[in-house]
């Protein structure tokens, strides 16, 4: 019999799944009371777009966000989104908040969403 992980994880959208046509900044995700986090980027259709994703971190929810150092990521942020893919990136940093920023260098659009999975909660969600 398999064990249940649903009650050991918490899933929060930082960029809700949508068709994007311009640069978008995700909402801050609070990592307080969690000892593990992963960022999941899910793409659908991509048309003439050159979106890149950057994961940012801060100790405050509304300001001070900077790019996460590569040493604090397990995996790479996509330089350009590819259609119908799922990318998972682990976060090992020590900041309380993370978010995703999608930057469009193209003239088209892309359908995607970015989700943060919080795990190893000190209190079950």
Regions found by a protein language model. Give the residues of each.
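C-terminal interaction-tip segments
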Residues: 1-13, 33, 104-125
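Surface-exposed beta-strand edges and flanking loops
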Residues: 7, 31-33, 55-57, 83, ...
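Surface-exposed ligand/attachment interfaces on beta-rich extracellular proteins
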Residues: 15-32, 45-67, 77-85, 106-109
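Noncatalytic modules at the cell exterior or secretory-pathway interfaces
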Residues: 35-41, 91-109
């Amino acid at each position: 019999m398999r064990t249940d992980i649903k009650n050991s994880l918490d899933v929060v959208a930082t960029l809700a799944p949508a068709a994007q046509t311009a640069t978008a900044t995700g909402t801050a995700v609070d990592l307080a009371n969690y000892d593990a986090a992963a960022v999941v980027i899910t793409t659908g259709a991509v048309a003439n777009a050159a979106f890149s994703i950057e994961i940012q971190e801060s100790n405050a929810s509304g300001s001070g966000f900077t790019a996460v150092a590569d040493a604090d990521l397990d995996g790479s942020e996509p330089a350009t989104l590819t259609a119908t893919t799922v990318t998972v990136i682990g976060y090992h940093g020590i900041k309380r908040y993370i978010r995703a920023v999608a930057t469009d260098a193209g003239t088209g659009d892309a359908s995607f969403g970015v989700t943060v999975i919080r795990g190893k909660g000190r209190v079950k969600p």
